């Protein structure tokens, strides 16, 4: 089990949200999906960083609750980075 959790705060309809989820699923990396309108953490990150695109994605350390990384929209580089981190931690 990984020491972090990938969160995707999405909005319907959202192609970048679907693409982000599809990429993680295709690569065997678990994530938690929330609705942006109900996710106060995602809203705070979006406001603090002037994010205007969906989804708002963030990675949380399961032990401390700290946000390790965050971005908005479909970001292949960031997604690949966290897929690789996940595979490294779980020994794939």
Residue ranges and their predicted role:
Residues 1-29:
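Local sequence-structure signature of Cys/Sec-based thiol-disulfide redox active-site neighborhoods
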Residues 15, 40-41, 77-78:
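Short alpha-helical
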Residues 15, 52, 74:
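Residue-level signal for short amphipathic helical patches enriched in basic/charged
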Residues 18, 22, 43, 80-81:
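Alpha-helical elements of the RecA-like P-loop NTPase motor core of helicases
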Residues 34-53, 63, 82-90:
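Thioredoxin-like thiol-disulfide oxidoreductase module
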Residues 55-58:
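Cytosolic beta-strand hydrophobic patch enriched in CBS
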Residues 60-92:
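Non-catalytic, surface beta->alpha helical segment in thiol-disulfide oxidoreductase systems
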């Amino acid at each position: 089990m990984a020491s972090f959790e990938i969160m995707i705060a999405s909005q319907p309809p959202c192609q970048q949200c679907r693409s982000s989820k599809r990429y993680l699923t295709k690569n065997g990396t678990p994530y938690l999906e929330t609705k942006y309108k109900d996710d106060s953490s995602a809203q705070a990150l979006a406001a603090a960083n002037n994010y205007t695109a969906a989804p708002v994605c963030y990675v949380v350390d399961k032990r401390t609750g700290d946000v390790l990384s965050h971005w908005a929209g479909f970001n292949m580089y960031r997604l690949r980075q966290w897929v690789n981190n996940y595979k490294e931690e779980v020994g794939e």
